[in-house]
Amino acid sequence: MAEPIELLCWGGDWDLPSVQTDSLTVLAYAKFAGAELTVKFVDWTWRTITASVPQIHYEGTTVTEPTQILNFLRKQRFNADFELTAKQGADTMAYIALLEEKLRPALLHTFWVDAENYANLTRPWFTSHSPFPLNFFVPGRQASLALSRILLTKAESPLLNITEVEGKIYSEAKECLNLLSHRLGNFNFFFGDTPTSLDAFVFGHIAPLIKAPLPSGQLQKHLNQLDNLCQFCNTILKNYFTDATAEKRMDCSPTVAHDPVDANLQKLTQLVNKESNLIEKMDDNLRSSPQHRPHRHEAKPSAPASDRNSTPA
């Protein structure tokens, strides 16, 4: 019997299988690709304090980072992207890069830097899931790392402190969410009725923002106005994580009428398209190599998507 693939990741709350973005991404992709993982939830211990979570352990090999874990699963013939075209594969890479550049800094700020959220939600949660004496200093250490990452990537002159950077990162995050909503349109998933790695990454980034009981949530309020993204998360939770989470729907605000796509959204769309075209050209040779047909996962049937509108790539 083959050794099971073991996944170490953060545990869940707020009706989510995990509260951490990267852990959610890997858990979702494994479900989409039909990978049977032995999931072990971890807390901060002396062994894991410097470790990268999530982690895959298999036959003496340890794999970290979501992109590397997804590549590992593909090599094991668990490939949720098998049926994507070269253009769709390039789009996937471009949108994942956009998430990391535009949305991740705002998520870090929301959960780890915003004083009200950190004091009333983030610190108490991670303190309660960390053993003594790590619970006294580990949350503060993570907050410092989050702040350093934000300033390192976003504090370009003349934006030299977190107060000045804050407006910039939230503005970019809202533009990113608008673009994702526009790209998703009326589809169930970003490439139709079948979820792929892009859906896993988007789910991992926006699900905690939707579900967490944030005392201070300007980005959460903006996301709750994008009804199709809320429904997107709700569909994934219902179809793939019913046993791991409570069977209640996302508490999303009613659909709010939006203004036509503004100039910033058009520029962001053009940027993603340009990066996607470049990746597609670089990817041609790789995709021409032979591939194994992946395992398929039979998801629970969901209601048909509403009338489809064409959306920009």
UniProtKB/Swiss-Prot annotation:
SUPFAM superfamilies: GST C-terminal domain-like
Region of interest (Disordered), residue spans: 280-313
Pfam family, one: GST_C_6
Keywords, alphabetical: Membrane, Mitochondrion, Mitochondrion outer membrane, Protein transport, Transport
Entry GO CC: cytoplasm; SAM complex
InterPro entries per record: Glutathione-S-Trfase_C_sf (IPR036282), Glutathione_S-Trfase (IPR040079), Metaxin1/3 (IPR017410), Metaxin_GST (IPR033468), Mito_Protein_Transport_Metaxin (IPR050931), Sam37/metaxin_N (IPR019564)
GO biological process, one term: protein transport
Ranges in a coiled coil: none
UniProt keyword Aminoacyl-tRNA synthetase, yes or no: no
Compartments it resides in: Mitochondrion; Mitochondrion outer membrane
Entry's family note: Belongs to the metaxin family.
Entry function: Could function in transport of proteins into the mitochondrion.
Description of how the protein assembles with itself and partners: Part of a large protein complex spanning both mitochondrial membranes termed the mitochondrial intermembrane space bridging (MIB) complex.
Protein name: Metaxin-3
Organism this protein belongs to: Danio rerio
